[in-house]
Amino acid sequence: MAAAAAGDSAVPNWVMLERLAFRRDDPASFREDRRTFASGTTSTGTQFDVSFILAEPPTPSRLYLSWPEGPKQESRGLVMAANRNLVLLRLDSLIDESDPFGEVVHDYFIYIADPSSQWTPLLRRLPPCTEYDDYFERQVTRVLPALAVGLLCHGEDEFAVAHLDIRSRKKKSGSRKKKLPIQAELCVLRSSLSCSDDAKWETKILPIQYQYDDLSSDFLYWSVDGVVPFKNALCFVNYCRGILFCDGVFEDSPKVSYIRLPLDTYIRGADGEARKGMYHGLCVTEGGHRLVFVDVARHDGKSYGPSMPNTGFTLTSRTFKMTGNCTTPWQWNEDAVVTSDELWHANTMESLPHDIVMLPLLSMDKANVAHLSLIDWDGGFSLVSIDLSNMQVMGPVITYLKGKDDTADADIVEEKKGLCAHFIPSEFPKFLDLRKRENHP
């Protein structure tokens, strides 16, 4: 069935997951690794297969999707989130392909890498998250933004899938007390791997804690650029503003705090935020014990496109710390500041092209190792790893997508123009029981 049975290579300790699924219904182009292969069924009864093709960072790991019975138009497969041995997937499809403005079904699946319970990974379809639609006059699948859904594991069995948004607070009549005029709306499904019968979505309205005087622009046209699991919390981050830090997701009353990002070079609420966010990254490193914000500041002040002549960038990393102080319960401590001049002086042009780096992601194991993306502004996509402690490039530049000349992955090149988001770090490969599958192709 597979174009290449990629099951003989070593498995990385952690991987960088591409968000876009490579749908390849033709058996000749569907790539399969038997160690990561799984099958599932959508809510409409169609069968599909998935397989992750694993790669050592900075090369992204891809999810290949074979869905011959699935819709041919207006369909998409996405990797939504990951934590420990679980990965959250979503398949989108129109119920009626003849109506491009009709109802879209979003099926969520938990991909489970659990060597103790089965020979190969499993796919479990989650119950739908629904809401009433005035147009259809009935309950329909709730549309959760592609970048705004998080996944969090608790213990060996429990997990939660969550989306957090903001909503206006209703003022009490006659009230003069000055309060933040918004609340957090948490939509969460809590379940367990051992039992899924009682899993259901819940909506909770929660207050937001903060330590700032003026938040007038922070939540204006708020959107989430990514969700990062950190210890017992989910960080819903807007890369040009701050983090909605949702702690205690598995408790009856989770706590939501707003934490500003240390954005020294940007104006909050400025135009072009979606593209400016591509120069920032919130990373969990050192085995999940450290939360670090990485900021790449362009010297030319542009939000996108090739850099101006004779300009570069400054990369700064800062670690998030809880202080225990009631007045200022958290702070950002500067770890490293590296300029492009220093990097370019320490490395050859061939090993590190003189261009802007984007989508920074630190290694899940080592805080000094940064994986950075290079875009040629014509759809081409490359990656490079740098040791920030000595500013040395680690290995060659990896060509990921060839841009307009990439005929094999032309669909992904086109889709990335609309969803060029951060890669998702995941350690699920180390939960694969490779011994069980070595002799079972």
Across the structure, where does each feature detected by a protein language model lie?
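General structural concept
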Residues: 2-162, 374, 382-387, 397-399
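Acidic/polar, low-complexity linker and loop regions
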Residues: 44-67, 181-218, 336, 345-348, ...
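A sequence/structural signal of beta-propeller blade repeats
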Residues: 74, 80-305
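Short loop/turn segments immediately following beta-strands, especially the blade-tip
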Residues: 115-118, 192-196, 247-253, 317-331, ...
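A surface-exposed beta-alpha-beta supersecondary segment
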Residues: 134-154, 327-372, 424
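Conserved blade-ending motifs and adjacent loop-strand segments that build the rim/top face
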Residues: 264-271, 275, 330-359, 395-409
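Extended serine/threonine-enriched, polar tracts that run as long, contiguous segments within proteins
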Residues: 289-320, 329-333, 341-353, 366-369
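Blade-level signature of beta-propeller repeat domains, shared across WD40, Kelch, NHL, RCC1
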Residues: 369, 376, 382-441
